[in-house]
Design a protein with these regions (language model features):
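Coiled-coil dimerization/phosphotransfer module
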Residues: 1-151
């Protein structure tokens, strides 16, 4: 088990430099390709490059980390066969939407309190952004995230 944790830590360090080196779009595309190749989850990807251009390097890394985290949640818990990742601009803010067609959950009974969700909320909080989770049992899960641009 320790070896797995060490590999994950190494992977995160490498991915940080990958976003800087190959860019956010390619980094996200790699996550999507892995979801399909290793987990047979169809991914629809919608990225507006002008939105990415308005994000700082740090914000781009935050977006990438959130996509990684939610992709892991989808793989581990959702039993989804398809997911959509959309990165666009809305109301002069970055808008990230990640949705799946999985089993969803009842937020009233099962609060999103895992370390993955906590990390997502903390990352967005640091940029005065907002996270909204829309989910119902047997109806998938959608994360709606907004991040203000830094001027």
């Amino acid at each position: 088990m320790q070896a797995v944790e060490e590999i994950r830590a190494l992977s995160k360090r490498l991915n940080s430099s990958i976003v800087k080196t190959v860019g956010l779009t390619q980094s996200i595309s790699d996550v999507c390709r892995n979801m399909k190749q290793f987990n047979d989850i169809d991914v629809t990807l919608n990225i507006d490059e002008t939105t990415i251009d308005k994000l700082t390097q740090e914000q781009q890394l935050v977006v990438f980390r959130i996509i990684q985290e939610q992709s892991n949640n989808i793989i581990k818990y959702s039993r989804a066969s398809a997911t959509t990742i959309s990165l666009t601009e809305k109301n002069n803010q970055c808008c990230l939407i990640i949705s799946d067609n999985g089993i969803g959950f009842d937020k009233a009974k099962q609060k999103p309190s895992g370390i993955g969700f906590i990390n997502i909320f903390n990352r967005i909080d640091a940029y005065n952004g907002k996270v909204e989770i829309n989910t119902f049992p047997d109806n998938g899960c959608t994360l709606n995230i907004t991040i203000p641009y830094i001027l």
